[in-house]
Amino acid sequence: MTKDDILPKKSKAFAIEIILLYKYLKDEKKEYVISNQLLRSGTSIGANIRESLRGQSTADFYAKLFISLKEAEESEYWLELLNETKILEQEKFEKLYNECEEIIKLLMSIIKHRKK
């Protein structure tokens, strides 16, 4: 399995985790603002990766991957805020943050490799 195959699967799994976290934060913690931002950025990663696979051009492909990268970076920021304000438990934070970091590394690797 190549990085190109792994990335859509990892980003979709991450999106599912983010959706479940959003539901938990909304229902149990009564937190709506940051969790909504995280829901948007965390699910957008995989959507843009999926769109990149059907890009109309090389430029379109890279544009979608760069958007995915920015959304992943934004997701890390929201996760950090939820963790540092003690809304999100450390164990859950570390799991999601590490998954997001893996996605970022894969995206950066693909972008660098394809540009050569």
Feature locations, PLM:
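Short, C-terminally biased terminal segments at protein or domain edges
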Residues: M1-A47, E51, G55-K116
